From Swiss-Prot:
Known role: This enzyme is an effector of chloramphenicol resistance in bacteria.
Keywords (A to Z) from UniProt: Acyltransferase, Antibiotic resistance, Plasmid, Transferase
Protein's recorded name: Chloramphenicol acetyltransferase
Organism: Staphylococcus aureus
Quaternary context: Homotrimer.
GO BP annotations, alphabetical order: response to antibiotic
Record-stated family: Belongs to the chloramphenicol acetyltransferase family.
Classification lineage: Bacteria, Bacillati, Bacillota, Bacilli, Bacillales
Length: 209
């Protein structure tokens, strides 16, 4: 996948990037999202919720360059043409989880079929990363389906090198005849401001309606 290098000296975000990159500033925003219609739709069509959410998340990311901006293995700042989801799958027997990646696709049906095939192959491997090699252009997505929450924060001590979003979904719940989902989005302030987080949340909510 193509990685497009950003010239920091001419980048209009240079001042902001340097400030927050040196501060190592990350932050997380958790929003309560209405998934009532999405739940009804996937139930009627026989789909599972998790891959539907993964597909919607990656759709938003791949529409917006800011969420694909990062640092590659050679230490260059830039952005990938697209990101692939690297998502967690729980093993009930061992109580461990695996991280599996599946190639993204604009078609949900095609993505869903690939997701199911990868699940069959790798979910019982009892390895942290059973599907190898893992491409550089992946975005971490996970779900904690046993508990709902109002906030979530994940800290990475990597000297600010990880700039991509991190998504950790909570357990959905019912309220006022609707179904809601705790949806935390964690970003690095060097590349993402509050405006961009709002953009992500609004686009995601529109997709799942």
């Amino acid at each position: 996948m193509t990685f497009n290098i950003i010239n920091l000296e001419t980048w209009d975000r240079k001042e902001y990037f340097n400030h927050y990159f040196n501060q190592q500033t990350t932050y997380s925003v958790t929003k309560e999202l209405d998934i009532t219609l999405l739940k009804s739709m996937i139930k009627n069509k026989g789909y599972e919720l998790y891959p539907a959410l993964i597909h919607a998340i990656v759709s938003v990311i791949n529409r917006n360059k800011v969420f694909r901006t990062g640092i590659n293995s050679e230490g260059n700042l830039g952005y990938w043409d697209k990101l692939e989801p690297l998502y967690t799958v729980f093993n009930k027997e061992t109580e461990n989880f695996s991280n599996i990646w599946t190639e993204s696709n604009a078609s949900f049906t095609l993505f869903y079929n690939s997701y199911k095939n990868d699940l069959i192959k790798y979910k019982d491997k009892n390895e942290m990363f059973p599907k190898k090699p893992i491409p550089e252009n992946t975005v971490p997505i996970s779900m904690i389906p046993w508990i709902d929450f109002s906030s979530f924060n994940l800290n990475i001590g990597n000297n600010s090198r990880f700039l991509l979003p991190i998504i950790t979904i909570g357990k959905f719940y019912s309220k006022d005849d609707k179904i809601y989902l705790p949806f935390p989005l964690q970003v690095h302030h060097a590349v993402c401001d509050g405006y961009h987080v709002s953009l992500f949340m609004n686009e995601f909510q529109n997709i799942i309606r």
